[in-house]
Amino acid sequence: MLFRSPPNMNTVPGVDMSTGSLGQGISTACGMALAARLQNNPCRVYTLLGDGEIQEGQVWEACMFASHYKLDNLCVIIDNNGLQIDGNIADVMSPYPIVDKLQAFGLHTIAVDGHNFDELEAAFAEAKTVKGKPTAIVMTTTKGKGVSFMENNAGWHGKSTNPAEFEIAMGELKAALAELEA
């Protein structure tokens, strides 16, 4: 499985750094975005963070850095599903209001339904047009979407299915896909 844990740079094409829940990915992404600009490289740098991960101070320091250096080639994507390994993020250490905080740190911020592909496509297109500041796309999602026993269940954070659970999950996902294709 590609994403049983944080994406691994050695097994997932396009992933340049293996990160985790401590927020170091955005700091590295800032360095990559600044280096690209200094080398006149027109690439864009994307980093994915979880809403539990943004409880880390390093994330907000990186946001200040990105804003200060006007890293408009940086796009920060936040999965806002309201859950982390320890439970509901609002109960553990609330990062809310996420959008307002990102804007206060100087990021152009776009809030989307993370399950709506049209909204996601529009957000990424908009991010490419923003000049003079980094962009954050905050996706509101449902953890475990499409698998009844996983939806909104923090207990599935980093947990693998057993063979029977896998079959049930795949059956539900295949049924949902067939419905979309109909």
What are these regions (language model features)?
Residues 3-68:
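Cofactor-binding active-site loop characterized by glycine-rich and histidine/acidic residues
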Residues 58-60, 86-90, 147-152:
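Short acidic, glycine/serine/threonine-rich loops at helix termini
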Residues 43-47, 74, 133-141:
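Generic beta-sheet signal
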Residues 40-43, 90-123, 174, 178-182:
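Conserved thiamine diphosphate
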Residues 56-81, 136-139:
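A short alpha/beta connector and helix-capping loop motif
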Residues 69-96, 100-102:
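Histidine/lysine/aspartate-rich catalytic loop segments that bind and position anionic ligands
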Residues 49-56, 80-84, 115-117, 143:
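Acidic, glycine-rich active-site loops and adjacent beta-strand->loop/helix elements
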Residues 117-182:
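Glycine/aspartate-rich loop-and-adjacent alpha/beta segment that forms the canonical ThDP
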